[in-house]
Amino acid sequence: MKESTRTSTPSSGAKPKGDREICLRPSSSVFLGDQQLYFTQEYLATNSLNMKYVVYFAACQFSGPIAVIYAAPKSWFIWIRTISGRILKRDLPCTDPVFIDWTRAHCLLVLSKNGRAQVLSSIGEKVSEVFFDNQVSDVHECRTFATSRGDSGIAVMDVDGQVAVVNSVSEPVIWSMRPPYSELPTAWTAFQPHSQLTHILLIFEAVFLMGCQGESLQVQNHASVWVDSSTKYVKCVVDDARSRIAMMTENGKIQIVSIDLSTCFCTVEVTEHEIGKCINFGWVGNSVVFVQMSSSLTVFVNVSARRKPGDEVRFMSIKMTANARISVEPDGIRLFESTRVEFVEAASREKIAVLNRSLNEDGAYLYKAAQEMEQGTGHNSFAASTVIQDMYKAIDDCISTACDTWQPEEQKLLLKAARFGMAYTNTTPDTTKLMRAIKEIRVLNELRMVRTGIPLTHRQYRIIGDTCIINRLIDMGSYSVAIKVAQWLGGENCESVDRVLLEWVRRSISKVSRSNMKMDQPALEALDEKISAKLLQFPHVSMADAARRAIEAKLPELARLFIRRETDDESHVAVLLQLNDVSAALTKAAASQRPQLIHQVVRHLMTSESRSSYELAISRIPLAQCLYQDLVRQEGETRGISSRQMLALLEQASDFERQTLFHFDVAEIERNPSERLNALRRAKDAAKSMGDKAIEEILNDVSAFAPLQIQRGQADMSVRDTIIEIADDTAKVAQLKQQARLNDKQVLLWTIEGLAKKGKMEQLFDLAQKRSPIGYAPFVKACVRYKRNEEVNKYFAKANGYSDLVAANLAKKNYVDAAKLAYDRRDREVLHAIHMKSHDDPVQCPRVKQLLNSMDQA
């Protein structure tokens, strides 16, 4: 067994930064076998953390805020701070707390002794509550666990050993599980494997019981192949990937096993320290565990799966100041001491290769070449670059290492190395990865500043993503940083900027509305000026959204001040309707000359006001009145009381054009011939009053023709249907032609169709014997339509001329023949139309398509 010591990592010679800045000194490192741990001092002079008097401590994963609970006489108080010490909430009272922890949704969970859990935001606002008090007696211990949905669950064990579980804190549904033994377990945990139910693992000395929701606890007999039954297990911790569990026995043995307890990957025994009596135990990345012996001593142990039985155990111990606390991150741990915050992480392969100048590592040679270039020794730089075998891998290693380092000077040099290597590639380099890395490093460095206090690592950043980072900044009230980050990541007009600004507006308005401040007109105008001045810097952000936030906060006068600045008419009208200021909305919609806005207001009126009220309001605006009439007509309200009211409105407004259309609609849907005729006559009178001679003449003809249709008993038939019906009576056809003022071509087409329909083939043939002014394609089409197949070829043979032949072939669905005619004429438009019609024939369509392609290629 060998203990390692820390060494300082060579830096680029940069001077230390001022107090309370990120990364005061270069990172130090230590090798634990095949693992290298990096120790980075994130912040110094963090006396405001005041760790000495802390009773309960919890740090949010992914470098989020920390929460501490202090005890005062007869009371408890919660303080929430960033890691750099900036206070987010102070002196928040709580009752009999026994446990605090952060969820992955950036919320603080405070569990009281009686089993009541409060869920708070990162600035101490109450979000929800979870009541375990009906399920458990006094709380003994508690565990939180990550879920597959990205949220957190909680498991609470009472003094009787019963476990109550909530799979998701945001949607609390409690279920419980009771072990078969009366004593409490020596170790236990809760976890949710990927795409599986929540599992509870209880260990009674060397007996392992596991169960999930809906099942009872079962003894895990298959674990006997690796369980040490001569001792008892005192700790068990699930890794961040939820695939392995680290077990610890009271005699100092650490075992790494699979999540289903079927396989033991690694066993390590530490004899230099009595680790079985530790106060904290957990993972550092994937291959190292830490054991906190006391508030001032922590041991790190290599538990890599690559260790072989009999290999020397590698560990190291570090001493810390008194009252130190540890928080676990997905890629490392964070040490909170009295005067500093330090991050411990297991280095990636790329970082080890580049920064340790490993032999035969292309990334290390490229980094050395960049350093030589920076120092002005170009010949040495060229010499270092010539030994690189895989330049693309070297570039990727330097970019990855730049993202993983903390010192800005070192980041710049590594990025320069990557850019330098691109000059030696055989193809045009793809700079996408480099540009993305520069953008992400810029964001990370901004987040790590003391004023923000989120020392996020690149690996953590990649896990939670851009949106989650911006959400966390919003939760903490860091709006200026959130806007800056959103602009860097998505550009000036990205949706994230809008979201940040509107959340700032909401919180600013809510803060004022909850206060005892008198909200008179000057105060509202001052708040309007403050918020508008900021929003107007971002033209893509709608003032209407700010007005909606004011409405939600029950400050309608403030909303009216906001909406005056809104330039989009649609948003302006929508907010006025929310304010129930209908007259202003109607005036604004009419002034915009946009019918859809007026429709929107009219519909709102029809659903919220009485008919007399909204018709009176609409009658004052002519355009609104016209659109209202359209709306009623479209909805079919043209009968009964609504019809008479509509007509009265039109007559009152002397709107003869709308009156004409109104009577047309009545005539169209009226089934009574007499009423239909009356409607047509009223339409004619309205057209006459309107002074439109053309419409008046048309209506005069229609109203004169309608009585004759009634006399013939054909009131429900159109002119076309009538001629088809009497096609074999030439006298009646001639009479109807004169009455309806039809042209010869139209009458001929309908007569052909009528004779074919009635089977009057002799009359049809006599008609065809005369020279047809419309060709013979209509004869073919009529015979095909009414299945007079024996007559089709007779008329098809008479067809002549290009258009007549094409139409006749189309009537017979001879698409290929029609296409050939069009192809010979080089008539692409007709050929394309034939191709579109041929799609219903899968045999002919490809051949027509071939002719079309041939014409396009010619």
UniProtKB/Swiss-Prot annotation:
Domain of life: Eukaryota
Coiled coil region boundaries: none
Keywords carried by this UniProt record: Endosome, Lysosome, Membrane, Protein transport, Transport
Matches recorded under Pfam families: Vps16_C, Vps16_N
Biased amino acid composition, Polar residues: 1-12
Mode of membrane association: Peripheral membrane protein
Gene Ontology molecular function: actin binding
Chief subcellular location: membrane
InterPro entries for this protein: VPS16, Vps16_C, Vps16_N
GO biological process, one term: endosomal transport
Subcellular location: Late endosome membrane; Lysosome membrane
Renumbered residue ranges of the record's region Disordered: 1-20
Cellular component, GO annotation: endosome; HOPS complex; late endosome membrane; lysosomal membrane
Known partners and oligomeric status: Probable core component of at least two putative endosomal tethering complexes, the homotypic fusion and vacuole protein sorting (HOPS) complex and the class C core vacuole/endosome tethering (CORVET) complex. Their common core is composed of the class C Vps proteins vps-11, vps-16 and vps-18, which in HOPS further associates with vps-33.1, vps-39 and vps-41 and in CORVET with vps-8 and vps-33.2.
Role, per record: Plays a role in vesicle-mediated protein trafficking to lysosomal compartments including the endocytic membrane transport pathways. Believed to act as a core component of the putative HOPS and CORVET endosomal tethering complexes which are proposed to be involved in the rab-5-to-rab-7 endosome conversion probably implicating sand-1, and via binding SNAREs and SNARE complexes to mediate tethering and docking events during SNARE-mediated membrane fusion.
Family listed: Belongs to the VPS16 family.
Protein name: Vacuolar protein sorting-associated protein 16 homolog
